[in-house]
Amino acid sequence: MTDHSCIPELKVRYVQQIVPDMMRDFGYSTVMQVPKLLKIVLSMGLGEALANRKLLDASVADLGVISGQHAVKTRARKSIANFKLREGNEIGVMVTLRRSRMYEFLHRLINVALPRVKDFRGVSPXGFDGHGNYSMGITEQIIFPEIDFDKIERISGLNVNVVTSAQTDQEARTLLTKLGMPFRK
């Protein structure tokens, strides 16, 4: 048996248990047909950042601590006069996780952060996009234990997009359920 000390626990479980289970359940003929996680994108939209520049920097730091990877600022693509928004203004923060960091983040999200949500009954099963990807919103970044409650500028939410190679929502839901995602019944 090989040493899996540096490979994330979820990745090991995916290779050893989930792939054979899904090949049997869906009748795939090759391992390459089995859906897998491609990336996880975390993003925060900060419309208030136009007035308060410190908020954007604090959000970059928060997302960096949550993900373990440096976050980048996103810019407005179009000007919208009603929102006093100009093209090129920095109005959001995002980070894309792949490989080991992706599996480690998903493990922390499922086993540490989501159980800390007040009155948590599972994530919504209605977050699939029809092409095997799942999106969910988190209302407070303080559910992650890495965030120090005393040092945060403002409580804000973030979007979590899980991109898979699944062709259908059913395949993606099965994959995420086997990885431990607690869907509402």
Swiss-Prot record:
Keyword annotations: Ribonucleoprotein, Ribosomal protein, RNA-binding, rRNA-binding, tRNA-binding
Pfam families: Ribosomal_L5, Ribosomal_L5_C
A GO CC annotation given for this chain: ribosome
Top-level lineage group: Bacteria
Molecular function GO labels: rRNA binding; structural constituent of ribosome; tRNA binding
Xref: InterPro entries: Ribosomal_uL5, Ribosomal_uL5_bac-type, Ribosomal_uL5_C, Ribosomal_uL5_CS, Ribosomal_uL5_dom_sf, Ribosomal_uL5_N
GO terms for biological process, alphabetical: translation
Quaternary structure, from the entry: Part of the 50S ribosomal subunit; part of the 5S rRNA/L5/L18/L25 subcomplex. Contacts the 5S rRNA and the P site tRNA. Forms a bridge to the 30S subunit in the 70S ribosome.
Role noted for this protein: This is one of the proteins that bind and probably mediate the attachment of the 5S RNA into the large ribosomal subunit, where it forms part of the central protuberance. In the 70S ribosome it contacts protein S13 of the 30S subunit (bridge B1b), connecting the 2 subunits; this bridge is implicated in subunit movement. Contacts the P site tRNA; the 5S rRNA and some of its associated proteins might help stabilize positioning of ribosome-bound tRNAs.
Family: Belongs to the universal ribosomal protein uL5 family.
NCBIfam families, sorted: PRK00010.1
HAMAP family named in the record: Ribosomal_uL5_B (MF_01333_B)
PANTHER family assigned to the protein according to its UniProt record, in alphabetical order: 60S RIBOSOMAL PROTEIN L11-RELATED (PTHR11994)
Protein name from the UniProt record: Large ribosomal subunit protein uL5
Species this chain originates from: Treponema pallidum (strain Nichols)
Biological classification of the source: Bacteria, Pseudomonadati, Spirochaetota, Spirochaetia, Spirochaetales
Gene this protein is translated from: rplE
